[in-house]
Amino acid sequence: MYEYIKGKYIGINKDYVIVENSGIGYKIFTSGATMSSMPKNGEEIMLYLEQIVREDFIGLYGFDSKEELEMFKLLLTVSGVGPKAALSLLSISRVNNLKYAIMIGDEKHICRGVGIGKKTAARIILEIKDKLKPDELVDSSLEIDTKDNENVMALSEALSALIALGYSEKEAESVLKKIDKNDSVENIIKNALKALMG
């Protein structure tokens, strides 16, 4: 029913933002990634929307990119994955990282989402993997050779390890761009930590 909303950003809550348009304040559920991109209160924003209607609930879900919206909708096609679980996955991982985790079958990465167990992670991989394009195997921002699956796995593990150690995904990605991706996982992590600690 709705394609997008453009209006004044009013504020943020635990799992939603408020956008005012024509005197009406819209409660829009969203991911941590989109929340982190919110401007100052009173500034204009635009979110791409998906409306979910159930017997006892009508909700708007919004994202700052069409790519994130499409990934949200794709996750909802998986049995056992509802809006909360989908938002959780999009909050702990950028869209491209989530895509390539699914493509290489990285259940550990997917299980980081709240309410996502091993069985659900396996279903997500099974039901979505073939729907993703081969060139989406790798997060393009990490500039990995898509032909070398071992490098992809190593970088995925290194990225997850750095995040687990408390570094932000942005910090981890930034330093991993400069590391030799043909090295072992252990050495990639060691070299990344050296770079991060100066």
Curated annotation (Swiss-Prot):
InterPro entries linked: DNA_helicase_Holl-junc_RuvA_I, NA-bd_OB-fold, RuvA, RuvA_2-like, RuvA_C, RuvA_C_sf
The record's note on quaternary structure and interaction partners says: Homotetramer. Forms an RuvA(8)-RuvB(12)-Holliday junction (HJ) complex. HJ DNA is sandwiched between 2 RuvA tetramers; dsDNA enters through RuvA and exits via RuvB. An RuvB hexamer assembles on each DNA strand where it exits the tetramer. Each RuvB hexamer is contacted by two RuvA subunits (via domain III) on 2 adjacent RuvB subunits; this complex drives branch migration. In the full resolvosome a probable DNA-RuvA(4)-RuvB(12)-RuvC(2) complex forms which resolves the HJ.
Gene3D superfamilies, alphabetically?
Answer: 5' to 3' exonuclease, C-terminal subdomain (1.10.150.20), DNA helicase RuvA subunit, C-terminal domain (1.10.8.10), Nucleic acid-binding proteins (2.40.50.140)
Task: Give the protein's recorded name.
Answer: Holliday junction branch migration complex subunit RuvA
Per UniProt, subcellular location reads as: Cytoplasm
| Gene, per the UniProt record | ruvA
Q: What is known of its domains?
A: Has three domains with a flexible linker between the domains II and III and assumes an 'L' shape. Domain III is highly mobile and contacts RuvB.
Name the Pfam families for this protein. Answer: HHH_5, RuvA_C, RuvA_N
Q: Where is this region: Flexible linker?
A: 144-149
Annotated region Domain II: the residues are 65-143
Give the originating organism.
Clostridium beijerinckii (strain ATCC 51743 / NCIMB 8052) (Clostridium acetobutylicum)
User: Which domain of life does the UniProt lineage start with?
Assistant: Bacteria
Q: Name one GO biological process term.
A: DNA repair
HAMAP family with a match to the protein in the record: DNA_HJ_migration_RuvA
Its Gene Ontology cellular component terms are: cytoplasm; Holliday junction helicase complex; Holliday junction resolvase complex
> Which keywords appear in this protein's UniProt record, sorted alphabetically?
Cytoplasm, DNA damage, DNA recombination, DNA repair, DNA-binding
Q: Name one GO molecular function term.
A: ATP binding
